[in-house]
């Protein structure tokens, strides 16, 4: 495995780290007024922080992602996949760990090391379940800010994220404009559309109508795996595109020559979705899906951007944006990215925009693509050179 990692120009063996914050008597005050603490944050870092502490980049992961952006864990087997953006983050890559210090944390409410509904409630000794307070994208970002402060980083070179990670990235730009030189939102939106909310509601209902959900109190017993698998199947369709599904599956049959005239998986696309759903239940928590999809549905910064003027929070003169969309993304279509660009320009922002032609749908930003790598490399190099001259 070590030779494979070296040949792949990977960051190599990495380790998940943990930081506990918002402890009594200073819990985090959430947007809805609830208090939460202590909070444990799982995170990973790659590269080295410069002496000037001016090369730090925060990457925000998507809905079901985690802090494992690149590299391998020491416990990985030879067939284990590297981090989810390994093609983009590493030595000499688009986000170059020989030049930049990369940070990624698991979001609040998730289930991959950061406090969420599956975590133990210190007051009861049991899992929070639905006693976990409703959190927003803003609350996730406020938690990340505590981590960045803990790491002693006064200002980030860039904040980058795709999909739900792009929402976090935009929230960072609004909440803490003085904390970053640049912002790169990818395949994202200023607010969830009715279409996106509708798909999330179907996913939530799939879980909440599973007889094993038990109003969220399923820890230590049978989990709502069927509902979670169906929720993932629904979500996965939104991550693809008509073109991608026609190219990959068409109407091809799954390991058979004739239709079964029953309810087996006759078509390859049926088998694929069942596989994706069943795989998901082994790595994700159903309650976390409920909380994160709801946080995404609540996300809406249109008014906050549109009311920003020359004296307000989005107008730090040195802050630059690179907005990226994908032509076949029907979850967050390019028109939504263009709306974001227009809103940012109206508020006096320095904005670059690129639509990448792809038939891979919403998840295209997670697929190796030289065009994305070149965009990242060039934009970040320009930002870093600019601040080095200050």
Curated annotation (Swiss-Prot):
Pathway(s) annotated for this protein in UniProt: Amino-acid biosynthesis; L-methionine biosynthesis via de novo pathway; O-acetyl-L-homoserine from L-homoserine: step 1/1
Reaction it catalyzes: L-homoserine + acetyl-CoA = O-acetyl-L-homoserine + CoA
Binding site for substrate: 232, 363
Domain of life according to the entry: Bacteria
EC number(s) given by UniProt: 2.3.1.31
Signal peptide: none
InterPro entries: AB_hydrolase_1 (IPR000073), AB_hydrolase_fold (IPR029058), HAT_MetX-like (IPR008220)
A single GO molecular function term of this UniProt record: homoserine O-acetyltransferase activity
Keywords: Acyltransferase, Amino-acid biosynthesis, Cytoplasm, Methionine biosynthesis, Transferase
Active site: residue positions: 163, 329, 362
Positions of the AB hydrolase-1 domain: 55-366
GO BP terms in the entry: homoserine metabolic process; methionine biosynthetic process
GO cellular component terms listed in the entry, alphabetical order: cytoplasm
Compartment(s) where it occurs, according to its Swiss-Prot or TrEMBL record: Cytoplasm
Known role: Transfers an acetyl group from acetyl-CoA to L-homoserine, forming acetyl-L-homoserine.
Subunit structure, as described in the record: Homodimer.
PANTHER family per UniProt: HOMOSERINE O-ACETYLTRANSFERASE (PTHR32268:SF11)
Family: Belongs to the AB hydrolase superfamily. MetX family.
Protein name per UniProt: Homoserine O-acetyltransferase
Species annotation: Desulfotalea psychrophila (strain LSv54 / DSM 12343)
Annotated gene: metXA
